Amino acid sequence: MTARLLRGGPAADALLAEATARAARLPAPPQLVMLRLGEDPASVSYVRGKDRKAREVGLKSTVYALPETTSQAELLDLIARLNADDTVNGILVQLPLPLHIQEQAVLHAIDPRKDVDGFHPLNVGELWAGRPALRPCTPAGILYLLDHYGIPVAGQRAVVVGRSSIVGRPLAGLLLHRDATVTVAHSRTPDLGAVTREADLLCVAVGRPHLITPDMVRPGATVVDVGINRVLGEGGGKAQLTGDVAPEVAQVAGAITPVPGGVGPMTIAQLLANTVLAAELQAKGRAAR
C-alpha cells in the first residue's frame, strides 16, 4: 500500500481563493506589515515568500527590514505606531529575533486584533476557550488541509507529537474543539511508538529528522509531517529538506503530507487568510462605533 499524498498546493490555492474573494468585498485591500531584523538567510527567504504571495492575491504588503542592532525599545515603538495605524490590518514579526530582544515582550506588544500569527496571549486564550478568531497559521492550515481532502477529524484518535506554542499546543486545542480525542506526546515521551501507533491521525512537529518510522504508525493512519529539516545528502552532498517522518512511512500510512510541499504552503495561505479576517473584524468594529 502506498499512502495518498496530501499536497499543500491545491488546498492552499483553495484557501487563498476564498480569502481573495472576501478581500475584494472590503473597502480597501487589507495591509500586512512584516518586520524583519537582520539578514538571516532563512528569515529573508521566508519574508520574501510571504510578501510575494500577499501581492499575488491582491493584498498590500509592507516589509520593514531593520538592522540586527535595532533595540527592543525601537522595535516596540514601531509596533505601537503600527497598532495605531488604521490602514494596517496585520502585523507579523519574523522569528527568531536577535538575542538582545525579548521575544515575548515583542509578541505581546502587537494589538491582538492585528496579531495575524495568533501568538498574543489573548488569542491563545480565545483558542482554548473554543472561540478562536486569529488562529496560529500552521495549526489552522493543517485543519484546512484535512478538510480539503475529506480527512475526518471528529471522533478520531489524534496524536500530536510536539508541544511548542507555535504548532503542537495550539494544534491540540483546535483538534479538541473539532471533537477529536487528543494525546500530546513529545521527544521525551517514554515508548513513543506505543503512543503513536494508537493514532488514526498522527501530527508530528518536533524538528528531528525521521523521528517517526514505519513501525510507529498504525496501518492506514493519516500522517501530517510538519517538520522541515536540512540534512546533508549521502557522502556529505548537497543539503536536502526532509521531514520528521521517515519516507518509508508512506508504505504504511493511508494518507501523508509530503516534505516539502505539504504543510508549508498552508502556513503562508493561512497567514494571508488571517490578514483578511483581521481586516473584516476591524471594519466591523469601526462600523459599530
Swiss-Prot record:
Could you list this entry's UniProt keywords, alphabetically sorted. Answer: Amino-acid biosynthesis, Histidine biosynthesis, Hydrolase, Methionine biosynthesis, Multifunctional enzyme, NADP, One-carbon metabolism, Oxidoreductase, Purine biosynthesis
Per the UniProt record, one Pfam family is THF_DHG_CYH_C
- In its UniProt record, which GO terms are filed under biological process? L-histidine biosynthetic process; methionine biosynthetic process; purine nucleotide biosynthetic process; tetrahydrofolate interconversion
Catalytic activity line of the entry? (6R)-5,10-methylene-5,6,7,8-tetrahydrofolate + NADP(+) = (6R)-5,10-methenyltetrahydrofolate + NADPH; (6R)-5,10-methenyltetrahydrofolate + H2O = (6R)-10-formyltetrahydrofolate + H(+)
GO cellular component terms, alphabetically, are:
cytosol
EC number(s) from the headed UniProt entry: 1.5.1.5, 3.5.4.9
What Gene Ontology molecular function terms does this protein carry?
methenyltetrahydrofolate cyclohydrolase activity; methylenetetrahydrofolate dehydrogenase (NADP+) activity
Which residues are listed for NADP(+) binding in this entry? G162, R163, S164, S187, I228
Q: What pathway does the UniProt record associate with this protein?
A: One-carbon metabolism; tetrahydrofolate interconversion
Record family assignment: Belongs to the tetrahydrofolate dehydrogenase/cyclohydrolase family.
Q: How does it assemble?
A: Homodimer.
What does this chain do? Catalyzes the oxidation of 5,10-methylenetetrahydrofolate to 5,10-methenyltetrahydrofolate and then the hydrolysis of 5,10-methenyltetrahydrofolate to 10-formyltetrahydrofolate.
- Identify this protein by name: Bifunctional protein FolD 2
Species name = Deinococcus geothermalis (strain DSM 11300 / CIP 105573 / AG-3a)
